[in-house]
Amino acid sequence: MGVRPCFRSVGPSERGALIRAVLFDLDDTLFDHRHASRQALEAVRDCHATVALVDASDLDRRHSEILEALHLRVLAKEMTLDDARQERFRRLFEGLGVSAADLEDGLLARRAAWAYRTRYIQSWREVRGATALLRALKPHVRIGVVSNNLAREQHDKLRFCGFDRHLDAVVISEEAGAAKPDPAIFRQALERLPAEAAETVMIGDAWATDIAGARAAGMRAIWFNPCGTSRPEAWHDVEEIRALEPVPAVMSVVFGNDNRRE
C-alpha cells in the first residue's frame, strides 16, 4: 500500500484563476530522492561496524542534516562536490562515535561516499504517479521544473525518469545564478515557459524554498506533503496534497473550478 492521498484545499478564492502553467520542484516532489538516499545509506552500513548498529531512521536524519548543510556550500561554490561528499561521511561517522584514528586518513569517508553514490544512482525512481500526472497536465498547461542543485545531476535525473520529454522549461540554480526561495529563479522559469505569475502554480515539498519562494514571486503554491509534516503557521490558505495520485484528484486541486481537469 502507498501513501494515503490527502487533498487539503484552504483558500478557494485563489483557485478561480485560470491556470496556464505548472512548476514543480524535482527532488522529493517528482524524483524520489528520499527513497534513493535511504537505500544508499544501507550500503554505507557495511563500511564500519559502528554504523551498522545505528537505527535506520536516526541514520537518515543525521545524514540529511549534514547533506543539507554541505549542499548549500556546494551551491555557493565554497566546496567542491567531491570534497563535500567526503566531508559528509566524515561528519556522519564522527557524530556516530567512530574513532578519530579510523577517520584520520580519509579512506573510510571516501569509501562510504563511493558506496553511497553507487547505490544512490542504482535506486533512482520517480515519486509514484509523477509521470502520469505530467502526461495528464501536458495537454492543458505549460510545465516546468525549478530545482536547487547542480545542473548535471538534475538533468541526469530528468532524463533517467523520462520527465524531460514532458517539460517546457527547466531552471536549475547552478545555471540560473539564483536559488529558491529567491524570486529571481522563479521569474526565470516564468520567462522560459512563458507564463505570468498569476496564472502559474508551483508544487513542491519544501515549505521554506518552494512555497515561500513561489508566493514571494506572486504565484499560487501547492504544498506536496507526503510525510504529513505539521503545517507551518504562515499562509494557512496554501493548499496541500500528500500524493501525486489519483491524478484526477490532483488535477482538481491544481485547476479548481476550471473544467480542463475533466
Please report, for each region that a protein language model flagged, where it lies by residue.
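Asp-based, Mg2+/Mn2+-dependent phosphohydrolase catalytic module
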Residues: G2-V22, R34-H35, T131, R135, ...
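N-terminal helical cap/lid subdomain that shapes the substrate entry/recognition surface
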Residues: G16-R128
